[in-house]
């Protein structure tokens, strides 16, 4: 088992991720949005923590990722960074903060990095945002790309179904992947695309390719932490594996607490001053 458990407390860097790909070591990645969860995830040995704009769904209850603001992402980013010693921390730039102009993209990227002290940022898109990616990287900020299903573009596509199933879209994705690498991205997330296409991308690129619903032949995997811990009900995509049933555990614990309070069993004599 990796991480603190095995005594490997060296800080994960973008360079180390490339080295992991080169030696065939899979990269583990999970989301976190708060200090306490980040401490646990980091201490368990995760390689990369993504402060995802999925906080819009998980933390705020929104239907999409679109409503979350830059300041809200900064708040979550700061909270996570404080809890992390080893993992590489990547923060999503939210919708509307890098699409309008290169100047605004760089300004917002610098703001996030200066305030959160994160290690890198993630942006969704290919050729459409490549000028913004170039400028941000030129400012010295590491960028992780994101292709395939892009939640920030949900209103464009209208569905969360598998992307790049037809030849035209697959070829564009492949072209965008190469373009992002050539522009200087240190890694790439592929979301919900055919496993065969993801395998080809991972094989052709020298940078790490991390998948979510993209098969097992990529260089690493990412999941939303509350999903894989079984905290959410009613969400069961094909790619999700639940490693715990915390929804049941937490519900039972809270019900027991309520019962103890109602009966006067809490606090007992040992729990008083």
UniProtKB/Swiss-Prot annotation:
GO cellular component entries: cytoplasm
NCBIfam families: panB, PRK00311.1
Broad EC category: transferase
SUPFAM superfamilies xref list: Phosphoenolpyruvate/pyruvate domain (SSF51621)
Substrates-to-products reaction catalysed: 3-methyl-2-oxobutanoate + (6R)-5,10-methylene-5,6,7,8-tetrahydrofolate + H2O = 2-dehydropantoate + (6S)-5,6,7,8-tetrahydrofolate
Places the protein is found: Cytoplasm
Protein function: Catalyzes the reversible reaction in which hydroxymethyl group from 5,10-methylenetetrahydrofolate is transferred onto alpha-ketoisovalerate to form ketopantoate.
Cofactor: Mg(2+)
KW Magnesium (keyword) present: yes
A family per Pfam: Pantoate_transf
InterPro entries: Pantoate_hydroxy_MeTrfase, Pyrv/PenolPyrv_kinase-like_dom, Pyrv_kinase-like_dom_sf
Subunit organization: Homodecamer; pentamer of dimers.
One MF term in the entry's GO annotations: magnesium ion binding
Family annotation (CDD domains): KPHMT-like
Predominant location: cytoplasm
Organism: Phocaeicola vulgatus (strain ATCC 8482 / DSM 1447 / JCM 5826 / CCUG 4940 / NBRC 14291 / NCTC 11154) (Bacteroides vulgatus)
Signal peptide: none
Pathway the protein contributes to: Cofactor biosynthesis; (R)-pantothenate biosynthesis; (R)-pantoate from 3-methyl-2-oxobutanoate: step 1/2
Enzyme nomenclature, EC number: 2.1.2.11
Binding site for Mg(2+): 53, 92, 124
Lineage: Bacteria, Pseudomonadati, Bacteroidota, Bacteroidia, Bacteroidales
Designated name of the protein: 3-methyl-2-oxobutanoate hydroxymethyltransferase
A GO BP entry: pantothenate biosynthetic process
Active site residues of this protein: 191
